[in-house]
């Protein structure tokens, strides 16, 4: 076992990586993160990773759907899941005394799901309704439209939810083949934050996850190449006009990544004193919602600026954004402003660490993507 400040990292006998932080709290959090998401789907599988996230709760060899949902709910806990372009995660929150129950449940649904055909057909309707809700929300849909242009003809450009045709086509065989390709020990990380020792946790995990197939994922990911600049306008009957400007950005292993994280925070991060909020919303009143985002993928990244406004103000908004970007390029930030920006980011990171569930999920993703975890002190030093 390797101890790195506040957490412990170790491997199970089959190669499944584990990160654990022991805390003296009555509530614990744990989850299994799998390096399998939308970009790992084949041409006829669009939306399959997300559909599996739903279907995996519909029955195992020893439990029906109700018993899966009730297993942690009945003792005040909860189980949940989510899918991204590159990951699928199943995780739970519970009282410490139910650690064994939570681990066994996550193991059961990920290793022993039977995907009853009748349940799959019902769940298709749920997912199709989710797609319709998404299509009715232009502030969400525009992100899919944007990524489909930036990552054109690449799986990263596919929508996480898939489309109506693909979802309707899924069968039990589709689900089983995807899981067989990608749900392997070396393609997973188990993350835990709670009041249990690492040695006891390892015993539990060997018991419940020792049966996970060892080895790496069978499928290799396609690399991404940047495309030329492009402008796309999509007509839609809405009260507001929605806009995203952006491009492919740094991957996790590039040194400039932290600089872009800091720049993103200064430009359009969550704080009310971000440049775009002050200059476009507060100064001119052109928009209610304007923000910048930096998403990181295994071998690439995505930087974007989103805004929505009355159509008559959209050109003014875009001009104002371009002016602020030009100022950032041409005018060097003062030492004082840079110091304040760094302090703000450090404070935000520290506050995010107040949530043990956030810690559990961030540890899992870092170990899965980068195969290492930086302590908060190390991150502060790099900033």
Task: Label every model-predicted segment.
Residues 11, 18, 65-224, 233, ...:
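Charge-rich, well-structured scaffold segments of protease-associated domains
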Residues 229-230:
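Flexible, small-/acidic-enriched active-site or ligand-binding loops
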Residues 15, 22-72, 146, 183, ...:
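Active/ligand-binding-proximal structured segments within catalytic/core domains
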